[in-house]
């Protein structure tokens, strides 16, 4: 086969791949599928992408390579026909609070450019467009100052820019200027110290020194004109008699200060200034609209848009509690009589008793306790058993007291304690828009840049399509190319089903599927051709309705002339592909082979392919023969949920059932289930400090004694954490080894078999098994420790054997092998068998937690819950548990979830996978659309009821599935 038409892989052995030979057609949409852990990602990411990326990076200079992450060479004999590779995974969502949907997609960068070039500044005082100031207006403003005021007339020639500026200073000296102000300090030009070119500097030239007198006008006008020429339309009148000593950097002494007038200076601009309030904008450049740049960022919140502030709801978590019983949470833990005596004194002044509930206090009394007596003096009597005293003073208030202590304390422990009562609130200075007043005063079509980022992508798309109608000819010409780039990117975001997000949405709050689709939209926006794209389950978190749009996007990427490889389990994606590779036959050591390849029809015709059997209907996830009975009395009821886009929603969740919360992306599922129900329930039942979304109340929590959110966050952030340590299987394994005759004879305790503490571990690598060597412009090399040869333990520890295996050998077994190996040790076997039950028999007992995918981490947590003794009163909440699961794995997972329900527990899942929804006892469908068009309950009831609701998109797709597939009593066809 010619290299041009195929990517030819020979002898791929990465991870569990069994010497795979494969030819993939170029410029096609290729789907790789197979059971979880069968080797799809090993082939797509760790072999094909890694080699494509490595070869591209290797072609760069050694200097450039040190800035790029270099991939390890995969274990493969040969790959031909590769292009430079780009991977779009789910793991790389930025948690940086400064990263937003707008910045990630680069739409915000184009918006900054648009506002800088065609935006019109308006005065906050008058609401009128800001005009430029004339020299006469500037002179009048200075003459209006108090007579005798001494001023420097300065020209701000450098503002916040890096450089040494030796040449510029020499030029100024030649022109006859003698003094400059550099970074807040005055110097003779000859005496200016060398400036560090790596740092930003401010340089003002002293053009004149004047004393305000009525006859100053002519001289002042000349000086100001000189300034305006030197500093590109800017001039500063700085008060010489300022309170700070000369030689110190003045607070706000730089020309870029946001207010045009301070106690030190007046900033004039012949470009933009409000004649009424004097509000001046130094410049309108793209950086003015950047919240990551000091020129544009709101100085109060540093461009984050939020501030940590004491939250009154966390101070008084339960309004029905009595004051003496700890209604004021920060005081509740203290055993000192001081706080109760403080409340008694306040009670005498405001007419309440300490036995009163918080809800019974007057508004005046509540305000006094929380915010202080505002100068009103209170007489306090204190008696701590050792001494008694009386004092009369105003009461500071719980919240001001905590705020003061938080600012003043040097103790990390004290800060942490106080932070438990703090919540993130929108910044009061910028209202959460992140920018300075100057940036927000610039508008296009009566909207500032912050208001546009708050729109949903759907609305922003419509706004940008219509806005050039309000431009004049010149503005239209300037904006044409910028608008084209913005509209294209918004259109792509719409196409991948993200029309409900806002551009201001923080990247850290996006789900894996959302962030992946955002990066997908950015890639299409870049318009590259001849590239190899490797994607990891882009359909995660996407409703069936939006699936077609996503697949159109992938086909568009292919049609640009790229090869698109997608690791995917979605039926529609597999059937749409040009070429399908099915890897199996099972997971882990039992996988790693290509079972079937070719068109979707070829896969269905292949009798060895498990995927083919599910696609053709020969096997299926079956609908239960009968659904559980719904209790009319035992149910949870969420009343009046109003968080995010929820529109005062109330819904019942029957206890002891399997409930699915469904709906299109952005319909309000996570807000309803995680932000409202889970956070409120865990606060009431588990005593957590999570702050739930706005709602009236939740009824029925008395039927529960535990609430658990089994999410996809990592089970540990270090390589030392693994499935055995997380599920608790490692403790009985260590105990077992410590109980062996050889260990007893040597006096070894269980700690001897831990790789985290000194004693039994190899000290050369400190129990890691590998040693990291930094290589700068080559990838960091992890070399196997030459003392323990990667075993993590020292020789003496490894001498203790059970059935001929050391503790290191046990950690290297798959979970399946481990369960068999410890079949006679129930404490270990039972925990490992639960991992097998959730479909994780293929992972290693000691596999590093950092190498587990989100779906795998979630199933490890599920296994841990399964191994606990059932109380039958637990509420389990899972967000998309089928992430990364093949049809066959979904069937297994459903068995596990239904088993939890059979024990009397309640399981609620957020899910788009119709195979899961059809087996649910109860469905709550939210929508009908995403974002503003969602937040309502569209349908509720059994799956058969949802199908009847015309407005429900879920119902429409579910109807096809229920009609297509018969009912069976078994959970999965074997």
From Swiss-Prot:
ATP binds at residues 34-41, 663-670. Its main location: cytoplasm. One of its GO terms (molecular function) is ATP binding. It comes from the Bacteria. The keyword Transcription does not apply. GO terms for biological process: nucleotide-excision repair; SOS response. Pfam families: UvrA_DNA-bind, UvrA_inter. Belongs to the ABC transporter superfamily. UvrA family. PANTHER family: UVRABC SYSTEM PROTEIN A (PTHR43152:SF3). This is UvrABC system protein A. The lineage of its organism: Bacteria, Pseudomonadati, Pseudomonadota, Alphaproteobacteria, Hyphomicrobiales.
């Amino acid at each position: 086969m010619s290299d041009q038409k195929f990517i030819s892989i020979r002898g791929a052995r990465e991870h569990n791949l069994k010497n795979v030979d494969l030819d993939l057609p170029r410029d096609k949409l290729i789907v790789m599928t197979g059971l979880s852990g069968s080797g799809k990602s090993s082939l797509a990411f760790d072999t094909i992408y890694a080699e494509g990326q490595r070869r591209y990076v290797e072609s760069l200079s050694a200097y450039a390579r040190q800035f790029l992450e270099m991939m390890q060479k995969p274990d493969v004999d040969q790959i031909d026909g590769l292009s430079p590779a780009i991977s779009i995974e789910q793991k790389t969502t930025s948690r940086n609070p400064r990263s937003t949907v707008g910045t990630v997609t680069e739409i915000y960068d184009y918006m900054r450019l648009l506002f800088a070039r065609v935006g019109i500044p308006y005065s906050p005082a008058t609401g009128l467009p800001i005009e430029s100031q004339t020299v006469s207006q500037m002179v009048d403003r200075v003459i209006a100052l108090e007579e005798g005021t001494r001023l420097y007339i300065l020209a701000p020639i450098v503002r916040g820019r890096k450089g040494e500026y030796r040449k510029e200073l020499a030029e100024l000296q030649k022109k006859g200027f003698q003094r400059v102000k550099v970074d807040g300090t005055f110097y003779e030009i000859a005496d200016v110290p060398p400036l560090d070119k790596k740092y930003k500097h401010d340089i003002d030239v002293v053009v004149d020194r004047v004393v305000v007198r009525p006859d100053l006008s002519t001289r002042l006008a000349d000086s100001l004109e000189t300034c305006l020429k030197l500093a590109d339309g800017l001039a500063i009148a700085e008060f010489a008699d300022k309170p700070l000593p000369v030689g110190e950097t003045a607070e706000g002494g730089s020309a870029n200060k946001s207010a045009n007038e301070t106690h030190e200076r007046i900033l004039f601009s012949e470009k933009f200034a409000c004649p009424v309030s004097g509000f001046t904008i130094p410049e309108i450049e793209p950086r003015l609209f950047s919240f990551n740049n000091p020129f544009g960022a709101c100085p109060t919140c540093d461009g984050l848009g939020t501030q940590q502030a004491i939250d009154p709801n966390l101070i008084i978590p339960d309004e029905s509690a009595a004051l003496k019983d700890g209604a004021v949470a920060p005081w509740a833990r203290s055993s000192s009589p001081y706080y109760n005596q403080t409340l008694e004194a306040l009670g005498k002044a405001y007419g309440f008793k300490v036995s009163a509930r918080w809800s019974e206090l007057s508004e005046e009394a509540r305000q006094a306790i929380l915010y202080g007596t505002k100068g009103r003096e209170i007489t306090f009597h204190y008696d701590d058993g050792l001494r008694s005293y009386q004092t009369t003073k105003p009461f500071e208030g719980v919240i001001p007291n905590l705020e003061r202590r938080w600012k003043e304390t040097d103790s990390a422990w004290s800060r942490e304690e106080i932070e438990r009562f703090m919540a993130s609130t929108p910044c009061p200075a910028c209202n959460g828009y992140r920018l300075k007043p100057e940036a927000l005063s610039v508008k296009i079509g009566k909207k500032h840049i912050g208001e546009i980022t708050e729109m949903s992508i759907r609305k922003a798309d419509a706004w940008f399509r219509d806005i050039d109608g309000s431009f004049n000819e010149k503005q239209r010409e300037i904006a044409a190319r910028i608008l084209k780039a913005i509209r294209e990117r918004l259109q792509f975001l719409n196409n991948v089903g993200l029309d409900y997000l806002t551009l201001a949405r923080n990247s850290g709050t996006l789900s894996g599927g959302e962030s992946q689709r955002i990066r997908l939209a950015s890639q299409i926006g870049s318009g590259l051709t001849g590239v190899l794209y490797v994607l990891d389950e882009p359909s995660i978190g996407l409703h069936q309705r939006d699936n077609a749009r996503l697949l159109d996007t992938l086909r568009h990427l292919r049609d640009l002339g790229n090869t698109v490889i997608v690791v995917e389990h979605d039926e529609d994606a597999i059937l749409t592909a040009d070429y399908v590779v099915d890897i199996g036959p099972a997971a882990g050591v039992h996988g790693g082979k290509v079972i079937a390849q070719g068109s979707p029809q070829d896969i269905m015709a292949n009798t060895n392919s498990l995927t083919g059997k599910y696609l053709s209907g020969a096997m299926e996830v079956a609908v239960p023969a009968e659904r559980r009975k719904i209790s009319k009395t035992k149910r949870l009821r969420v009343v009046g949920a109003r968080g995010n886009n929820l529109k005062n929603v109330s819904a019942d969740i029957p206890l002891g059932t399997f409930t699915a919360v469904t709906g299109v992306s952005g319909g309000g599922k996570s807000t309803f289930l995680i932000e409202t129900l889970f956070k409120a329930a865990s606060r009431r039942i588990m005593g957590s400090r999570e702050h739930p979304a706005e709602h009236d109340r939740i009824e029925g929590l008395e039927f529960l004694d535990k609430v658990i959110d089994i999410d996809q966050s990592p089970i540990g952030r270090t390589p030392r954490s693994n499935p055995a340590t997380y599920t608790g299987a490692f403790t009985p394994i260590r105990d077992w080894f410590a109980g062996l005759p050889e260990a007893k004879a040597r006096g070894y305790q269980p700690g001897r078999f831990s790789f985290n503490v000194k004693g039994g571990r190899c000290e050369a690598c400190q129990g890691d098994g590998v040693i990291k060597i930094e290589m700068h412009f080559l990838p960091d090399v992890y070399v196997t420790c030459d003392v323990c040869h990667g075993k993590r333990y020292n020789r003496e520890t490894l001498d203790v054997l059970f059935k001929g295996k050391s503790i290191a050998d046990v950690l290297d077994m798959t979970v399946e092998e481990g369960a068999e190996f410890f079949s006679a040790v129930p404490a270990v076997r039972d925990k490992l068998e639960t991992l097998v039950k959730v479909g994780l028999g293929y992972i290693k007992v000691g596999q590093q937690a950092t190498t587990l995918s989100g779906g795998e981490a979630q199933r490890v947590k599920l296994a841990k819950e399964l191994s606990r003794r059932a109380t039958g009163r637990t509420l389990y909440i899972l967000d998309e548990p089928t992430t990364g699961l093949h049809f066959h794995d979904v069937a297994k997972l459903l068995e596990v979830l239904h088993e939890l329900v059979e024990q009397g527990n309640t399981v609620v899942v957020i899910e788009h996978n119709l195979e899961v929804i059809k087996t649910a006892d109860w469905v709550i469908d939210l929508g009908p659309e995403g974002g503003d068009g969602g937040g309502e309950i569209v349908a509720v009831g059994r799956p058969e009821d949802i199908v009847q609701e015309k407005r429900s998109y879920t119902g429409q797709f579910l109807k096809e599935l229920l009609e297509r597939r018969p009912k069976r009593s078994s959970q999965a066809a074997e």
